[in-house]
């Protein structure tokens, strides 16, 4: 099992836990944490923020991952640095949600150029869950707008009702209770649920696919070394 740690505090809200301010990660503390715990990855606080309200023109303190990377490289330690709270919050998706009856205000993310500049500084994993949530929510609203007969569907009509009731929400988990069995088990009871889930999948692909290209990861999957379970066991026994 790969283990990811986190050091520092990101402002914003994640899974109903809110922090009003950020505490930047001290590079020396990060190196000590990595040495003592042996984590495979470490999420750091260097200017990102959870949620869709990160403020305009957020700037990342790239000197923090640079310092950590330089120290662990000199010590011969491998640890991937992780960027939490890094959603870009595409403005076209926010606009489309609001045009479809949503009410998302003051939603701004991290500029893609800032994230691209952080990658050479040691960032190896970038979390963009808010982007995925926005794209999925937009797609569900769009589906019910284009096919109004689905609003009274016995299986997914409840999803539409929640979309209408909670106009400022964009976390799909808020809207999924009527189809929670499908979400948890993969069981698809009818064509309406299958159609809705296809829109969910398309939203995930849209959000992630564009960033894979921006971050320079397109076409690199074959370069990842494949390891068997036995190989992994042997590696982590060292």
Predicted regions and their residues:
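Short catalytic/ligand-gating loop segments at beta-alpha or beta-beta junctions
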Residues: 83-88
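Alpha/beta enzyme core
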Residues: 1-80, 91-96, 100-108, 112, ...
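C-terminal alpha-helical cap/extension of soluble enzyme domains
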Residues: 104, 113-238
């Amino acid at each position: 099992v790969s283990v990811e740690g986190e050091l520092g505090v990101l402002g914003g809200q994640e899974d109903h836990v809110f922090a009003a301010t950020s505490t930047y990660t001290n590079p020396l503390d990060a190196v000590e944490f990595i040495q003592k715990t042996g984590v495979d990855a470490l999420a750091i606080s260097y200017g990102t923020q959870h949620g869709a309200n990160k403020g305009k023109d957020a700037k990342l303190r790239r000197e923090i991952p640079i310092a950590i990377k330089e120290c662990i490289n000199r010590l011969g330690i491998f640890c991937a640095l992780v960027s939490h709270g890094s959603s870009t919050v595409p403005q076209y998706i926010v606009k489309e949600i609001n045009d479809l009856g949503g009410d998302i205000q003051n939603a701004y993310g991290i500029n893609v150029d800032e994230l691209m500049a952080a990658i050479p500084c040691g960032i190896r994993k970038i979390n963009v869950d808010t982007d995925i949530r926005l794209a999925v929510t937009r797609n569900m609203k769009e589906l019910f707008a284009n096919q109004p007969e689905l609003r009274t569907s016995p299986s997914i009509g409840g999803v539409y009702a929640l979309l209408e009731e909670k106009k400022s929400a964009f976390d799909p988990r808020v809207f999924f209770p009527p189809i929670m069995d499908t979400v948890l088990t993969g069981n698809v009871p009818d064509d309406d649920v299958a159609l809705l889930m296809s829109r969910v999948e398309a939203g995930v692909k849209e959000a992630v696919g564009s960033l894979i290209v921006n971050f320079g990861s397109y076409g690199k999957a074959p370069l990842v070394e494949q390891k068997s379970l036995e190989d992994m066991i042997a590696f982590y026994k060292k």
